[in-house]
């Protein structure tokens, strides 16, 4: 029991800064929306539309680079720290290549925006302008993620938290300057949010690099001079590990976007209630997602040390802590769901629907916690392909079709509206949790030599 308590302390010490960093990042998006809304409702809508396209694109790159964390954790645990610098440099090359692709997609996103049904031309122009300003921040964001993944792979999660809050604090005045045109800058309205956020991402990257260069704990990693050339073998391995994670993230984000589109014809009350419940459950999701990042670090580190038993301990402890957290957040959600809904909207119909949907959200919080931590465990074992297959099957083969049938058809019961989609979420997330646990159990039953060989690739 003592080993599990000790492991839980280590996991929480790693996870809490990640939680706070994620809150800071979420708050940046909130600040952009609110400050654009302070200028005009059109600018607020433009930022919201632009963000809905930016997120899937940038999260694809973010997911691709998540492969660095278990690679660095495993090298750190095995005492091969001299190889970390080369992996990080290849991570920067990969981030640069992916940034170019993302920037091309975002530059041409105007075709998607202008094809939206009944969209106001002025709104479309502002959304395109916002994206074309924000896309210049894509390299800065992804370079920052490489540097952050380096730190987190070395079990240093506090720098990412600090840089996240620095970015948030800088974002507010820089937004103000570019939205309203102060200190000699042009008045860009909502487009100014894109300029400001792009600048902040570069500032966060430069601040993180400055920290890494000065950190004594990373002195031995900075032993390579000059800029390493692209190493096709290393980059290929990073892509093999990262692409399934990137696709899984992409399919998860697009799932919720598709459901939002399917709910939209049902009426204002249904859309508002669905959005409130989804926004709150997304906030609760930060906890298990951050714990999953910590579990990846611990599992990768233990496998690097050559201890499959300690890796199992880290995995099991992460699951136990995650289930405890999810139980508490589920109780909190059930107990205060009406009061929470009132914070968003005071329309009685909207509040009633949102409270009902939050009850369904509470049901899946334990499953959601297990599946996301299970994904973190599999990343630690470098078993990322299974994450993609499980996520795709659970969300798009099981969850979305069942939700559609329950919400919009009478094949099983009378159309349930938004609640049907939320039952679909429960089916999808529970299926993902079961499959993640089965895969983890399969991996952990393999001979230690095979597990360690797979982890060292």
From Swiss-Prot:
Transmembrane helix is among the record's keywords: yes
Subcellular location: Cell inner membrane
Highest taxon listed in the record's lineage: Bacteria
Organism: Shigella dysenteriae serotype 1 (strain Sd197)
Sequence intervals crossing the membrane: 11-31, 53-73, 93-113, 127-147, 160-180, 192-212, 243-263, 276-296, 314-334, 350-370, 387-407, 418-438
Alphabetically ordered keywords of this record: Antiport, Cell inner membrane, Cell membrane, Ion transport, Membrane, Sodium, Sodium transport, Transmembrane, Transmembrane helix, Transport
Topology within the bilayer: Multi-pass membrane protein
Side Cytoplasmic, residues: 1-10, 74-92, 148-159, 213-242, 297-313, 371-386, 439-457
GO terms (BP aspect): sodium ion transport; xenobiotic transmembrane transport
Family: Belongs to the multi antimicrobial extrusion (MATE) (TC 2.A.66.1) family. MdtK subfamily.
InterPro entries: MATE_fam (IPR002528), MATE_MdtK (IPR050222), MdtK-like (IPR048279), Multidrug-R_MdtK (IPR022913)
Physiological role: Multidrug efflux pump that functions probably as a Na(+)/drug antiporter.
One GO location term (cellular component): plasma membrane
Gene Ontology terms for molecular function: antiporter activity; xenobiotic transmembrane transporter activity
Periplasmic face of the membrane: 32-52, 114-126, 181-191, 264-275, 335-349, 408-417
Protein name (Swiss-Prot/TrEMBL): Multidrug resistance protein MdtK
Pfam name, any one: MatE
